[in-house]
Each structure stands twice: as C-alpha cells, then as structure tokens.
C-alpha cells in the first residue's frame, strides 16, 4: 500500500468524468489499497479514485470507522451506479477531502439502490440509506466530475471556489 496525495480544489482534474473499469485486475486492487490508506490517513470516510488523480470509476468507503470505536468496514465499489432513488429527501452536513475545512448541508435522496462490482469481480445490487446513501451519492458525484458544492446555491458555490482559487494562487496548501 502507498499513501497518495489527495488533489484539492481548484484542481481541474476534479471535474473529469472517470472512465469505467473494464476488468478487476491486480492494479485495480492495489489502487483500492492505496485509496484506503490515503482515506484513513486524511482522515475521511469515502474517497473516489479521481481524488488521487486516477480517473477510473472506483470508490472506497468506510462509514463505520467514523464512529470512532475502533471498528472498521472497508468497502470498495467498482463502476458504481445509482439504479433507483427515493423521492423522500434527507439533509446531511457534508465535507470533502478535496475541499478541506469546508462543510455545508446538502439535500439528497434518503435512500438509493446501487449496482457495482466488488474487488472479486462480482456484480452486486444493494439498498443504501442514512450516511451510507449520502456518502455513496457524494462519491459517485466525484466520478462524474461533480463536487458537493455544486449542490449549493450559485452564490455559496462561487464563494467556496473563489476561496480555494485565491489560496492556490498564494501557494497555501491544505493538508
């Protein structure tokens, strides 16, 4: 496993649409391992491959670890897609490893049905709700070049993007 640098807004690569994974290879499994290590070190509960400058449709998540009781449930999702969503909405305060130290409430479907491939190459479908639903939607957005600030008002989004552009020009690096 290797610790990888997480790219930060305003890096244009965050707006790239990630390419599908055509085969679950040793390289994809190693990338997932690197992502878990980088995600835990950050620390975060979800990471899309594009956030470490790898434009492939791979997500790692561990929402159990957020509880802080030493438990863990690392999960990898290859080519994840939302195949159904509830009309009922939920609001969570979201943050992002690529937009450090900024949090905002985002409204998303309360439950979603996802289809994905696991690291053994098995295609699976499952229902997600609560934090799992919010996190998987947030990470799938990354694979499509969408950031959580894109769900905010134009004014709030512009303020956040401007803040990070100014910081980048001044050479301020978030860690």
UniProtKB/Swiss-Prot annotation:
Coiled coil: none annotated. GO terms for biological process: co-translational protein modification; translation. CDD domains: Pep_deformylase. It catalyses: N-terminal N-formyl-L-methionyl-[peptide] + H2O = N-terminal L-methionyl-[peptide] + formate. Binds 1 Fe(2+) ion. Its cofactor is Fe(2+). The keyword Protein biosynthesis applies. SUPFAM superfamilies: Peptide deformylase. One of its GO terms (molecular function) is peptide deformylase activity. Its EC number is 3.5.1.88. The keyword Iron applies. It comes from the Bacteria. Fe cation binds at residues 96, 138, 142. Keywords: Hydrolase, Iron, Metal-binding, Protein biosynthesis. It holds the Pfam family Pep_deformylase. The active site is at 139. Belongs to the polypeptide deformylase family. Removes the formyl group from the N-terminal Met of newly synthesized proteins. Requires at least a dipeptide for an efficient rate of reaction. N-terminal L-methionine is a prerequisite for activity but the enzyme has broad specificity at other positions. This is Peptide deformylase. It comes from Rhodopseudomonas palustris (strain TIE-1).
């Amino acid at each position: 496993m290797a610790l990888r640098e997480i790219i930060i807004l305003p890096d244009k690569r965050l707006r790239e649409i990630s390419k599908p994974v055509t085969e679950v290879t040793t390289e994809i499994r190693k990338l997932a391992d690197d992502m878990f290590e980088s995600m835990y070190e950050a620390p975060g509960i979800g990471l899309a491959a594009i956030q470490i400058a790898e434009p492939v449709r791979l997500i790692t998540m561990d929402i159990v670890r957020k509880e802080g009781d030493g438990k863990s449930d690392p999960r990898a999702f290859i080519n994840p897609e939302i195949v159904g969503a509830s009309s009922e909405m939920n609001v969570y305060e979201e943050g992002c490893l690529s937009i450090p130290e900024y949090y905002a409430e985002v409204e998303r479907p309360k439950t979603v049905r996802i289809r994905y491939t696991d690291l053994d190459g098995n295609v699976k479908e499952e229902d997600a709700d609560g934090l799992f639903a919010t996190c998987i939607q947030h990470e799938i957005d990354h694979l499509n070049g969408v950031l959580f600030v894109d769900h905010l008002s134009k004014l709030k989004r512009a303020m956040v993007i401007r803040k990070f552009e100014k910081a980048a020009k001044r050479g301020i690096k978030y860690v």
